[in-house]
Amino acid sequence: MSCLNKISATRHLGYFSVVAVASLVFLALNVLTTIKGDDIIYMFISDSSPLTPVRTLHDVAVSMHNHYLTTNGRLANLLAQLFAAFAGKSVFNVANTMVFAMFIMLVSQFVSRKLLAVYPALTAMFVMLFAPVPGETMLWLTGSCNYMWSLTMSLAWALALLHPRLASRQSPLHITLLIVASVLAGSMNESVTATVLLGMVLFFALNRQRASRTVIIMLTAYAAGVALVLASPGAWLRFANGSDMPKDISLLQMLTSRVTRLLRQSQPIVLPYAAAAYGCWRIVRHRRSKQLPTSPQACLFAAAIVVMLIFGLNAQRPYFALATFSFIAIAHAAAQTINSRPALRHATTVAAVVLCFVPMPAAISSMITARFTDEAVTRAIKSAPAQCVLPAPSAPKPSRFVMDNIYNSAHYHSYAEFYCALYGKSNVCFLPSDIYARYTSPTPLLHDAVQLPYDSSDTAAPAAYALPNVQATIVPISPQLTTTGFAGMHIANVEARCTSRWQQIKMFFYGSLSDYRNYYTYHFTHQGTTYLILPPVSPDIDRIDIFIKPHRPASAPSDTITLTRLTGK
């Protein structure tokens, strides 16, 4: 018995040692990660005008109310605001590392209930090699609250739901605590919580004998949390505006684009393909006995596929839950073999640990470069005059471990007003090299410009111009005009842009065969004139819509200025 206890203690020591080492490495990566644009957004009351810093808990309540109405209803963003406005990045680094340790242990528990070092080692390997953009889903303050924290809470909730003790009668206090915890976990982030809800409902539908009264109560409370997020006016507003997915496409194109996006976003993750192949093999194998895979791991993976097909999102971040449940399904399938063969288990542990360090040098190099860039840009903004116009730095080499701040206003300009509020500036923009050369030149910006054949609906933005060797459209605007930072362009014949039938089919399946697209804009003042900068306009653009904020001057006729291409031009 003494020998068995020593062996058990050694195994547990290895398990917690791997978790501890992985957490220390993760803490170092957290320290290298800087504050990002969205983190600055949460330093201010959402949708306040002018932007007002968050200073009290009442400010947080007002901010989250506004956020629910205009953006989304995720509880995860409350955590992001508390860290960004009060606790600070250093406290977040420690808290995020603790959540990461919980994440590793919870994922390991879903793979196998045995406390063996191989499972946290494999989970750490998954994070380093396969997790979608860990710099955005696990290290970035706002992103980690939305994805890693959300999934960690939901994994803990799902494990509690599967605990045999729930089959017995619970006290009213215990039920109350479970309801509150379920609602909170369900309202974190819809791409995570909708997946977990669907997966657990599917599991208990296939295993009805385990669906006790307490389980049904917890599922209902968790579903209420998910519904709170999905029912937020802000979420529906984003959907109506086409912010997250195109809406002006046919039903067939919508369906094909979702399948295409799922397949395309799963390619860098790899694991969804492997898990799907294994699942198909299991289904074929058990078809004769009519015993389909009904484990919670299989149900959660299937649910993740369905939810991603429904949402049809194009960014990598929302696929974090799908990647994690793909890993869990594959590792769980191999767990019985690993548990029964010590030599294989030890070899797998060593291999997983070694593979964890393969991407580390490149990741650390990219993170250090990004940190130096962020610090240099911050110093430049602080030392700049009220109108801060800086040259856009060279685009960094893409890295899964770095959330890019996008210091190029032609690519993204939504952080400008928050930089202004944080650093006390009237304008902050980062100009591409061709525009910056014009800005620093003593000659007028439009001295050799060519006026484009568009008629404007408003004298506040009377005309559009093109400049030689400059990839932009220049629109002189009234200094009192406040734009939203977006413009829409209508394409007269989008099919004509396709150079071949294959390209047209490809655009159709990708959901990009749309005749109306939104673009980022930015503005600056040069020699006393304010200019709005738009992307270059091609001859097939027959209408440009410049979107104006509602508090524009009362003399302006509408909240959109339209430039219409002249007939025959």
Predicted regions, residues:
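Intrinsically disordered, polar/acidic, low-complexity terminal segments
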Residues: N5-T71, Q81, A85-M102, V111-L116, ...
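Membrane-interfacial loop-to-transmembrane alpha-helix junctions, especially the N-terminal start
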Residues: H12-Y15, K114-T123, S171-H174, A211-M218, ...
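Transmembrane catalytic cores of multi-pass membrane glycosyltransferases
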Residues: A28-S90, V94, L141, S182-A302, ...
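Membrane-interface micro-motifs in multi-pass membrane enzymes
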Residues: R74, Y119-P120, A124-L162, N189, ...
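Transmembrane alpha-helical segments of multi-pass membrane glycosylation machinery
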Residues: F92-S108, V127, L151-S154, F327
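Transmembrane alpha-helices and membrane-interface helical segments
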Residues: M105-Q109, A156-H163, G199-N207, A275-I283, ...
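Membrane-interface transmembrane helices that cradle and orient dolichyl/undecaprenyl
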Residues: S154-H174, R210
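Signature aromatic-anchored transmembrane alpha helix within multi-pass, membrane-resident enzymes
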Residues: H174-I175, Q336-M360
